[in-house]
């Protein structure tokens, strides 16, 4: 039986803005960092493909590394060479109002000798902003991913025959309302981890 852990957080944040006015066509540095349309993405900033009201940012990479202790053990260390194949895509809107961004990625880890350690991780997500008025915005994001715990992780059983697989569902939502130099924000977040059962090196199910 898999193990599921959920967490929900709700917070209210009130921020006093500095002196000075901001015109309708200007955004402060803080506003730009918070606004999903202005978030910097160094990995994707180099090339973009325009597609109507969206820009598509594809990414592909190949990496390799040598690990002299792939099981992160204190004795009987095992070495191997690992190849990582990754591909990802991000689609961002170019609208003057509102925003919608989508992303997805896949990473394949291939071990030269210890193929039981091979794993496939992937993720998908969407985030956006609804500009209700000049001073009011809704923001939200939802993400889902399948991943594996690293060997040596404190929560990962050392006797597992394969890396522990888990899925993660996340969601966030917030509402901002500006009152002259005062901004009130209400935000909440949710996360749910689902750890899959594993089998030990002697065939015992690890729950």
Name each model-derived stretch.
Residues 1-35:
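Cleavable N-terminal export/targeting peptides
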Residues 24-207:
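Gram-negative and organellar
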């Amino acid at each position: 039986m898999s193990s599921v852990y959920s967490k929900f957080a709700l917070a209210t944040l009130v921020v006093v803005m500095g002196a000075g006015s901001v015109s309708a066509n200007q955004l402060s540095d803080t506003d730009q960092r918070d606004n999903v349309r202005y978030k910097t993405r160094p990995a994707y900033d180099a090339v973009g493909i325009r597609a109507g009201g969206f820009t598509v940012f594809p990414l592909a990479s190949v990496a390799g590394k040598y690990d002299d202790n792939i099981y992160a053990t204190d004795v009987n260390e095992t070495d191997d060479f690992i190849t990582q194949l990754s591909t990802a895509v991000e689609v961002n809107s170019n609208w003057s109002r509102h925003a919608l961004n989508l992303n997805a990625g896949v990473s394949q880890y291939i071990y030269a000798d210890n193929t039981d350690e091979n794993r496939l991780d992937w993720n998908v997500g969407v985030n956006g902003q609804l500009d209700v008025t000049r001073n009011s915005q809704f923001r939200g994001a939802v993400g889902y991913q399948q991943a594996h715990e690293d060997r040596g992780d404190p929560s990962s059983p050392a006797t597992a025959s394969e890396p522990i697989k888990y899925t993660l569902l996340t969601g966030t939502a917030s509402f901002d309302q500006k009152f002259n130099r005062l901004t009130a924000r209400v935000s909440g977040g949710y996360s749910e981890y689902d750890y899959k059962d594993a089998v030990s090196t002697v065939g015992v199910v690890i729950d």
